[in-house]
From Swiss-Prot:
GO terms for cellular component: plasma membrane
Membrane topology: Multi-pass membrane protein
Record carries keyword tRNA-binding: no
Stretches assigned to the Extracellular side: 114-134
InterPro entries per the UniProt record, alphabetical: LMBR1-like_membr_prot
UniProt cross-references to Pfam families, sorted A to Z: LMBR1
Protein name (Swiss-Prot/TrEMBL): CASP-like protein SELMODRAFT_416721
Segments traversing the membrane: 93-113, 135-155
Keywords: Cell membrane, Membrane, Transmembrane, Transmembrane helix
Homology family: Belongs to the Casparian strip membrane proteins (CASP) family.
Topology feature Cytoplasmic, residues: 1-92, 156-166
Oligomer status and interactors: Homodimer and heterodimers.
Length: 166
């Protein structure tokens, strides 16, 4: 349950801080083009079977291209693109912090309500009941958010590589 909020907070931490200059963009794009040519060269394909190593290098190359495009938005609405990048980075931080809170609340509820016999405190059950008494669908909506977060955490944990070193 920790991979989703940690990934979101790290995505905020590793975001592009400012738009890079055109000279930096050209240099980085040239380096990426060289790496791309090395990956697709006929001699390399003959030396190696196009297996796991080449596919992994291709994935890393695609990640680097995406990071470069985020750091240097292009087109007619480059300013808008940069603003959207900044807003998405801030949203990742906010959802990461909220996700961290949900990741702490779920196990705490399991310990307080499920593992202790008799239950020490109704905790989330009481919260959902109180929200339902405030407005009919508020408790149901809060429960749906908790369940959706749990599913997204499981999917994030499944997709997250165990040893993400390049």
């Amino acid at each position: 349950m920790a991979t989703l909020p940690v990934s979101l907070v790290f995505a905020f931490k590793n975001r592009p801080k400012c738009v890079i200059t055109r000279a930096q963009y050209v240099k980085e794009a040239t380096d990426l083009a060289k790496r791309s040519n090395e990956l697709g060269s006929p001699t390399r394909r003959k030396d190696e079977s196009f297996g796991k190593i080449s596919i992994q290098e291709l994935v890393f190359l695609e990640d680097d291209v995406q990071a470069l495009n985020e750091a240097f938005p292009q087109g007619e609405k480059a300013d808008t693109s940069w603003a959207v990048t900044v807003l998405f980075s801030l949203a990742k931080l906010v959802f990461g912090i909220l996700g961290l809170a949900l990741s702490v609340i779920w196990p705490l509820h399991i310990i307080v309500f499920m593992l202790v016999n008799p239950p020490a405190f109704p905790f989330l059950n009481q919260v959902f009941i109180q929200l339902d008494s405030a407005w009919g669908l508020l408790g149901t909506t809060a429960f749906a958010i908790f369940c959706y977060y749990l599913v997204m955490s499981v999917i994030s944990g499944e997709m997250h590589s165990i040893h993400p070193m390049k």
